[in-house]
Amino acid sequence: MTIARILAAKGRDVVTTRPDLTLAEVAGVLVAKNIGAVVIADDQGGVIGILSERDIVRAVAKRGTTVFNEAVSMHMTTEVITTSEDEPVHVAMEKMTNGRFRHLPVICQERLVGLVSIGDVVKHRLAECEYEHKAMREYITTA
């Protein structure tokens, strides 16, 4: 199974924001949209960073609540690890597990086309396991 299959099921909508917004403004977006990360994009739609709940907590823990008045660009992760639509799901899962992050932007021809979370990946991996389990049971009972 590939990342494209996950995107086909969940949709391709991605919440993006500009790097000049304040941390408080973007935290408000995370709360309003009930999401754990937002992609920071340039004017052409290219990914220049990602900001997660963890990034916000880390900033507050290091420097206090004054960080909420600072630009997102000061706190976003700029070395963004990405995936492609044709990448196998297990490879994306390994990237997230090994990198200890939960959100993976999907890029096609240098453009953002989706975002998958570890929850999306686990959900689809479980569905795949259930399908395989059912197929094995049917094979055993009909043999």
Model-derived regions: residue spans:
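A glycine-centered beta-loop-beta connector
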Residues: L30-K33, V38-R54, M96, L104-G119
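Short, charged helix-to-loop "capping" segments that act as catalytic/coupling loops
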Residues: T2-P19, A41-G46
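Tandem CBS (Bateman) regulatory domains
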Residues: M1-R12, S52-I81, P88-T97, I118-A143
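The conserved cystathionine-beta-synthase
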Residues: T16-N34, I40-A41, T82-R100, I107
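Short, charge-rich amphipathic segments
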Residues: L21-K33, K62-M74, E110
